[in-house]
Swiss-Prot record:
The lineage of its organism: Eukaryota, Metazoa, Chordata, Craniata, Vertebrata. GO terms for molecular function: antigen binding. V region of the variable domain of immunoglobulin heavy chains that participates in the antigen recognition. Immunoglobulins, also known as antibodies, are membrane-bound or secreted glycoproteins produced by B lymphocytes. In the recognition phase of humoral immunity, the membrane-bound immunoglobulins serve as receptors which, upon binding of a specific antigen, trigger the clonal expansion and differentiation of B lymphocytes into immunoglobulins-secreting plasma cells. Disulfide bonds join 41-115. The gene is IGHV4-28. The keyword Cell cycle does not apply. It comes from Homo sapiens. This is Immunoglobulin heavy variable 4-28.
């Protein structure tokens, strides 16, 4: 019984902690070719300044996840080399949110976009 109780704590604790943090993406559902995609991720239940990195990923239809990049709360950024020339990320600690801009979009950029911690 001790082992079962320990196992339940081990599994349940991370879910309890993670449930306190919520990320909510917002932005247009559709963007015209050659336009700029602008997305914002609002963070609740956690101070954006308390975590090192905040990121963006995407999943094209029928494909796997693709890393876009991530940003440090101070503003330092790291981008996927294949997207670097078109990506800009920013962070707004006063609003507890961070943003993604992807310029000159084409059909290749069709995907579900996610923010992540």
């Amino acid at each position: 019984m001790k082992h079962l109780w320990f196992f339940l704590l081990l599994v349940a604790a991370p879910r309890w902690v993670l449930s306190q943090v919520q990320l909510q993406e917002s932005g247009p559902g559709l963007v015209k070719p050659s336009d700029t995609l602008s997305l914002t991720c609002a963070v609740s239940g956690y101070s954006i300044s308390s975590s090192n990195w905040w990121g963006w990923i995407r999943q094209p239809p029928g494909k796997g996840l693709e890393w876009i990049g991530y940003i440090y709360y101070s503003g330092s950024t790291y981008y996927n080399p294949s997207l670097k020339s078109r990506v800009t990320m920013s962070v707004d600690t006063s609003k507890n949110q961070f943003s993604l801009k992807l310029s000159s979009v084409t059909a290749v950029d069709t995907a579900v976009y996610y923010c992540a911690r």
